[in-house]
């Protein structure tokens, strides 16, 4: 990838969230989980309209992969979240060749500054590279091991992939089932980067490279479909826009 390209990531923080949860009393977890789901759904739907994609990570703190989203589009996603949240919501959006660097810049800005929305202009061309990673034969594994043991296996896999991702500046998110997403650095070869993330021989990955997160995910899904349907042997297939 061209080193001049950079990925934009926004950090969304619900300020005072823990304190709010403690005010709900002991019979609160169902309330918290329901609200978290509603906020995530609203944020994801709003972001998708502008080519973005939300990673819930902690739910009280979420990431918005937002390459080529303008400040007003960020504001609309922030408003969608604030309309449901019970606490103050803030957002900071920064760029970086490595997505983890963009997150760290945004988080530091939220700690230093008081604005509701902080939007730093990107020096490079905004782009996104995303890998959609999954486990081979997960249906057969689930039939043999059951849903809980299969889930534990995928969580162990997620932890191993995330350790590698941290070292190279990528961001990972569990998507459910056997699916793991990785937002990739834009320096070097994406194939070589993803090859490091495939920590087992029974993994495959579709990789999408595009100006927006939503387009990148669509391309990654197409690439993964080619591997699953044996149109392309894989285990890595890259599609770019």
From Swiss-Prot:
GO terms for biological process: biosynthetic process. It catalyses: GTP + 3 H2O = 2-amino-5-formylamino-6-(5-phospho-D-ribosylamino)pyrimidin-4(3H)-one + 2 phosphate + 2 H(+). It holds the Pfam family GCH_III. GO terms for molecular function: GTP binding; GTP cyclohydrolase IIa activity. Its EC number is 3.5.4.29. It is an enzyme of class 3 (hydrolase). It comes from the Archaea. InterPro entries: GTP_CycHdrlase_3, Nucleotide_cyclase, Rev_trsase/Diguanyl_cyclase. Keywords: GTP-binding, Hydrolase, Nucleotide-binding. Catalyzes the formation of 2-amino-5-formylamino-6-ribofuranosylamino-4(3H)-pyrimidinone ribonucleotide monophosphate and inorganic phosphate from GTP. Also has an independent pyrophosphate phosphohydrolase activity. Belongs to the archaeal-type GTP cyclohydrolase family. This is GTP cyclohydrolase III. It comes from Aeropyrum pernix (strain ATCC 700893 / DSM 11879 / JCM 9820 / NBRC 100138 / K1). The lineage of its organism: Archaea, Thermoproteota, Thermoprotei, Desulfurococcales, Desulfurococcaceae.
């Amino acid at each position: 990838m061209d080193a001049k390209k950079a990925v934009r990531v926004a950090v969304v923080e619900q300020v005072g969230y823990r304190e709010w949860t403690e005010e709900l009393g002991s019979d609160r977890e169902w309330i918290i989980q329901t609200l978290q789901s509603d906020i995530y759904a609203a944020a994801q739907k709003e972001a998708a309209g502008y080519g973005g994609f939300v990673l819930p990570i902690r739910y009280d703190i979420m990431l918005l992969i937002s390459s080529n989203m303008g400040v007003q589009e960020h504001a609309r996603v922030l408003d969608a979240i604030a309309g449901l949240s019970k606490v103050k919501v803030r957002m900071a959006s920064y760029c970086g060749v490595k997505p983890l660097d963009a997150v760290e810049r945004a988080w530091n800005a939220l700690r230093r500054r008081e604005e509701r929305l902080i939007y730093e202009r990107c020096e490079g061309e905004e782009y996104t590279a995303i890998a959609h990673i999954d486990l081979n034969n997960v249906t057969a594994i689930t039939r043999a091991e059951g849903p809980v043991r299969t889930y534990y296996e995928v969580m162990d896999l997620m932890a191993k992939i995330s350790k590698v991702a941290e070292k190279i500046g990528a961001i990972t998110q569990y998507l459910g089932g056997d699916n793991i997403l990785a937002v990739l650095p834009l320096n070097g070869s994406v194939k070589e980067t993803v090859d490091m993330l495939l920590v087992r021989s029974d993994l495959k990955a579709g990789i999408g490279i595009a100006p927006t997160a939503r387009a990148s995910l669509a391309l990654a899904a197409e690439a993964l479909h080619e591997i699953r349907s044996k149109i392309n042997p894989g285990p890595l297939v890259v599609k770019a826009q």
